[in-house]
């Protein structure tokens, strides 16, 4: 059979792989938001999900420039590797970066630092930045497989004038039809990666050869154990007297505030090795490594109701 015969036989039977189908869905959502809203912004933490989302957004408008900025809500308690990767990616891609700093709100007396973790304070800073920049839509990298509150959130998630989310009052989403209707002061959070899994994310990173911060791969690091979780020794996070420091080969499955982000023991130093580890994991990355989700059974939902990512 010639190549022409094969093409003729397969004409009309074009099939997308599941990764390309997810990519097409995400690009459709990104373009829909860009067409429907006046001032969208892409929330960018420097983690794997937001890096994949930025990659998709750039691809959605190529060869043109990204028609909206990216915004990092900076707690001031960051992994240095993540900030370096953020700055490098922004410089390479030529996107406009907006940085909203929690420290600015602490200095101005708008929020009070009562606990070591600044993770809860991000909500105030995020909502202030959305309000000051008059953003009417914000892309988030949340996925439904991460956590049960995120599992029930719509792709277009409506937020009222206070930035709050009501999980009992969500709009229906049929097929690929999304309702972005909102009044002045309200906004929409859009989640292009809603239907992706951690395995999908890593498979796409491998397929597209996307560069990530080095802490996503196995490396030697000084850690200590707290509440069954390995935490990194850092200037913003020190062990207690009864928490001995040990050095292990670890990697991070998710990236957030240093004070509440744990790591896992691992020897996976390449994308293919991480994919193999992910395939046999029985815990989501947030369930395994995020102390902020262990506050209560409804910890994430309570924060999202207040305006969290």
Curated annotation (Swiss-Prot):
Q: What is its EC number?
A: 2.7.7.4
What's a single GO BP term from this record?
Answer: sulfate assimilation
Top-rank EC class of the record's enzyme: transferase
Which one Pfam family would you cite for this protein? PAPS_reduct
Q: In which pathway does it act?
A: Sulfur metabolism; hydrogen sulfide biosynthesis; sulfite from sulfate: step 1/3
Q: Which GO terms describe its molecular function?
A: ATP binding; sulfate adenylyltransferase (ATP) activity
Asked whether the UniProt record includes Nucleotidyltransferase among its keywords, one would answer yes
Disulfide-bonded cysteines: none
Keywords in alphabetical order: ATP-binding, Nucleotide-binding, Nucleotidyltransferase, Transferase
Q: Which reaction does it catalyse?
A: sulfate + ATP + H(+) = adenosine 5'-phosphosulfate + diphosphate
The question of whether Calcium is a record keyword is answered with no
Top-rank taxon of the source lineage equals Bacteria
By sequence similarity, the record places it as follows:
Belongs to the PAPS reductase family. CysD subfamily.
Role noted for this protein: With CysN forms the ATP sulfurylase (ATPS) that catalyzes the adenylation of sulfate producing adenosine 5'-phosphosulfate (APS) and diphosphate, the first enzymatic step in sulfur assimilation pathway. APS synthesis involves the formation of a high-energy phosphoric-sulfuric acid anhydride bond driven by GTP hydrolysis by CysN coupled to ATP hydrolysis by CysD.
NCBIfam families found in the cross-reference section = CysD (TIGR02039), PRK05253.1 (NF003587), PRK12563.1 (NF009214)
- Binding partners and assembly: Heterodimer composed of CysD, the smaller subunit, and CysN.
Task: Spell out the protein name for this chain.
Answer: Sulfate adenylyltransferase subunit 2
């Amino acid at each position: 059979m010639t190549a022409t015969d094969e093409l003729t036989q397969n004409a009309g039977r074009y099939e997308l792989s599941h990764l390309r189908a997810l990519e097409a869905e995400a690009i459709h959502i990104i373009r829909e938001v860009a067409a429907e809203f006046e001032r969208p912004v892409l929330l960018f933490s420097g983690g794997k999900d937001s890096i994949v989302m930025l990659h998709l957004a750039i691809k959605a408008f190529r060869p043109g420039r990204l028609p909206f900025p990216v915004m990092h809500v900076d707690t001031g308690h960051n992994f240095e590797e993540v900030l370096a990767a953020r700055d490098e990616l922004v410089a390479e891609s030529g996107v406009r970066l907006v940085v909203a700093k929690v420290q600015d709100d602490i200095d101005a007396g708008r929020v009070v630092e009562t606990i070591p973790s600044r993770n809860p304070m991000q909500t105030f800073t995020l909502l202030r930045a959305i309000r000051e920049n008059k953003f009417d839509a914000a892309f988030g990298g949340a996925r439904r497989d991460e956590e049960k509150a995120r599992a029930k959130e719509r792709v277009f998630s409506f937020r009222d004038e206070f930035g709050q989310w009501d999980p009992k009052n969500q709009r229906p989403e049929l097929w690929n039809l999304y309702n972005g209707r909102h009044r002045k002061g309200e906004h929409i959070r859009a989640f292009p990666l809603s239907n992706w899994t951690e395995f999908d994310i890593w498979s796409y990173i491998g397929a597209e050869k996307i560069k990530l911060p080095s802490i996503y791969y196995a490396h030697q690091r000084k850690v200590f154990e707290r509440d069954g979780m390995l935490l990194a020794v850092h200037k913003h996070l020190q062990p207690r007297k009864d928490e001995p420091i040990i050095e292990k080969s670890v990697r991070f499955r998710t990236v957030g505030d240093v004070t509440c982000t744990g790591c896992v023991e691992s020897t996976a130093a390449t994308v293919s090795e991480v994919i193999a580890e992910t395939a046999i994991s029985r815990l989501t990355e947030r369930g395994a490594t995020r102390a902020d989700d262990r506050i209560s059974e409804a910890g994430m939902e309570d924060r999202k109701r207040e305006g969290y990512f």
